[in-house]
Regions:
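Feature captures the catalytic ectodomains and active-site-proximal regions of enzymes
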Residues: 1-508
Length: 508
């Protein structure tokens, strides 16, 4: 039931990090008297917004998708790479039902286990440490025949560094006493995502039929490719002689890529009975195929090691369940973030959740119009506040992030100066209703726009982000928080219980 009639707003200044150093810092350089006054007048703290604190690998910069997921969920949302690595560290990986199923299938059929995926530590599609964990698991489970089908990277890592990874793999197999490299293919062939089936066919034929280029070992396969002037990404599918590692009836395959888009086509070629991408020279019967994550909800004849998790009781869902009303508002560039990502990857709005999309300006790059659509967003949100319709308003200003990405400091300063005109109007409007605002950011950007050598930085920063409580009677905020603490803080400020699923801590 509705007990709380004063409006609460979460205002996200996208890309507005906290940086005490003024060098290369467009936020510090901007003329922003109103924002300066707000930051001085109201109690605040800073929040961690990158790396392990938002479910990313240590030291990895945050981003808008991850930031809004964590804010809306009220818990750390582990990204696939981190989640799998964590499972390896805590040992649950080795008990994984789908992975165990593959091992059991191989033992029952006295057959072979094939591991396929991108051989690098790029961390975008896969990670070599996950492959090593699978080899360790196979050894522990008593698997005798194990083959690795190496897809070479050269995109998320330097263009010619495959030998390093092949050598690491061979060392690991030697140390474990299990495994052979069966094939080596550039990701251009094995990881196509644009239905260029002629490429996928070459990778399939190497793995299933031992057809293609031939080489005595993995390193030779790479060196032969280099002599043909092929970088890692483009290495022609190559079969390792005497490995006898083709995929046969009754075998099991584990695809260890966790990113779906480039794992779908090669997977479908092996598992789909109705496959029509190319004429398969050999169809594999009684194949147990495991995907590391969900590559495609419609993919037939596969099991998933790490199925997608649905999140219960995100902030939006919980507010709706309390019979309260909410508004999401942003310009085009950040609309998906305050809706889809904020709702835990769910497209449909919650009950009593209204949405306002303000079109972003049609310019080639936002340094040409650094105010973007901030004034229009402000106008719309002021109208919405005046209706007294909403208990919770989630607002995103895109400027510090999108103009920060252009690398043009003067434009980024103007972007912040536009916010300086908008934010105080909204503060006044909310305070006139005796409401409250939590002002924050999802990650930094405009706070670091030059590196120490004076080069332009267009990426996000690793800096903390602000959290202020703006109210007629503001509350002190506890230090040491991270983005997942925002939702529990909002609920406490609204005098609502915090659901058990939210493992973030209220900072009031």
């Amino acid at each position: 039931m509705k007990e709380f009639n004063r409006p609460t707003m979460l205002m996200i200044l996208d890309g507005y990090g906290i940086n005490q150093d003024t060098y290369g810092n467009a936020i510090a350089a901007a003329d922003k008297p109103h924002l300066d006054e707000i930051f001085t007048k109201y109690p605040g703290t800073t929040l961690k917004a990158c790396g392990l604190d938002v479910g990313l690998p240590e030291g990895q910069m945050g981003n808008s998708e991850v930031g809004h997921l964590n804010i809306g969920a009220g818990r750390i949302v582990y990204q696939d790479l981190t989640m799998i690595t964590k499972a390896i560290e805590d040992g649950s990986f080795f008990e994984n039902e789908a992975l165990q199923k593959a091992m059991a299938h191989v033992k029952e059929n006295h057959s072979a286990l094939h591991l396929l995926g991108l051989l690098s530590d790029g961390g975008v599609h896969s990670h070599i440490s996950h492959l090593f964990a699978l080899i360790d698991m196979a050894k522990k489970e008593g698997i005798e025949n194990l083959y690795v089908h190496c897809f070479l990277d050269g995109r998320d890592v330097p263009p010619r560094c495959a030998e390093k990874y092949i050598s690491q793999l061979e060392d690991h197999m030697k140390k474990t006493g299990l495994g052979k490299i069966a094939t080596v293919s550039g990701r251009y062939y094995a990881m196509d995502r644009d239905k260029r089936w002629d490429r996928v066919e070459k990778a399939y034929n190497a793995m299933a039929c031992s057809e293609g280029e031939q080489a005595p070992d993995g390193a030779s396969a790479v060196n032969q490719a280099y002599s043909r002037d092929e970088n890692d990404e483009f290495v022609l599918p190559t079969v390792i002689e005497n490995a006898n590692g083709s995929v046969n009836n009754g075998d099991a395959m584990i695809m260890f890529n966790f990113r779906p888009d480039r794992a779908r086509e090669i997977t479908r070629a092996f598992v789909d009975e109705d496959f029509d991408g190319f004429e398969r020279k050999k169809e594999i019967k009684d194949l147990c195929y495991i995907c590391m994550t969900q590559y495609d909800a419609e993919m037939p004849n596969v099991s998933l090691a790490f199925p997608p998790e649905t999140m219960a009781n995100t902030l939006g869902e919980y507010i709706a369940d309390q019979g309260l009303t909410q508004l999401r508002i942003a310009e085009t560039e950040k609309y998906a973030h305050v809706t889809f990502f904020f709702n835990g990857g769910v497209e449909a709005p919650n009950r009593n959740e209204d949405r306002i999309l303000v079109p972003s300006p049609k310019v080639a790059t936002y340094d040409m119009q650094p105010e973007m659509s901030a004034y229009e967003v402000t106008e719309k949100v002021l109208e919405a506040i005046e209706t007294d319709k909403y208990d919770l308003i989630i607002l995103n200003f895109a400027n510090a992030d999108m103009v920060g990405h252009t690398g043009v400091i003067e434009a980024a300063k103007k972007a912040i100066e536009a916010l300086d005109k908008c934010v105080p109007q909204i503060v006044d409007s909310i305070l006139a209703k005796d409401g409250q605002i939590l002002l924050t950011a999802d990650h930094g950007n405009a706070d670091v726009m030059l590196d120490k050598d004076g080069n332009t930085v267009t990426a996000h920063s690793l800096n903390d982000v602000p959290l202020l409580h703006i109210a007629n009677e503001p509350k002190q905020l506890k230090d040491g928080g991270r983005l997942c603490d925002i939702a529990p803080t909002i609920l406490k400020l609204m005098h609502l219980d915090i659901p058990a699923e939210m493992t973030g801590k209220p900072l009031v």
